């Protein structure tokens, strides 16, 4: 029986063959997905998904709602706000 911490599915299971010929299970963190727009769901440009040790302010573009919505949605929202 695995340790209680390993019973969760938050860690993915990888079967690894050892040099002795046994097959053992290694537990790894799951890969993170690409950042997506909150409105359209399309992948965000300018967001470095590989560098997760930095904070979001370092990774995200420095514009309003950078790292949350795509540039098209932001442009549409700004146009809507100006025309109102």
Curated annotation (Swiss-Prot):
Single GO term (MF): structural constituent of ribosome
GO annotation terms (biological process): translation
Keywords: Ribonucleoprotein, Ribosomal protein
Cellular component, GO annotation: ribonucleoprotein complex; ribosome
Lineage: superkingdom: Archaea
Homology family: Belongs to the eukaryotic ribosomal protein eL34 family.
This protein's name: Large ribosomal subunit protein eL34
Organism of derivation: Pyrobaculum calidifontis (strain DSM 21063 / JCM 11548 / VA1)
Classification lineage: Archaea, Thermoproteota, Thermoprotei, Thermoproteales, Thermoproteaceae
């Amino acid at each position: 029986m695995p340790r209680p911490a390993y019973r969760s599915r938050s860690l993915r299971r990888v079967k690894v063959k050892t040099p002795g010929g046994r097959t053992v299970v290694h537990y790894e963190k799951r890969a993170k997905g690409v950042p997506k727009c909150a409105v359209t769901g399309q992948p965000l440009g300018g967001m470095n998904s590989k560098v997760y040790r930095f904070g979001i302010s370092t990774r995200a573009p420095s514009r309003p709602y950078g790292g949350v919505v795509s540039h098209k949605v932001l442009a549409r929202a700004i146009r809507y706000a100006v025309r109102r």
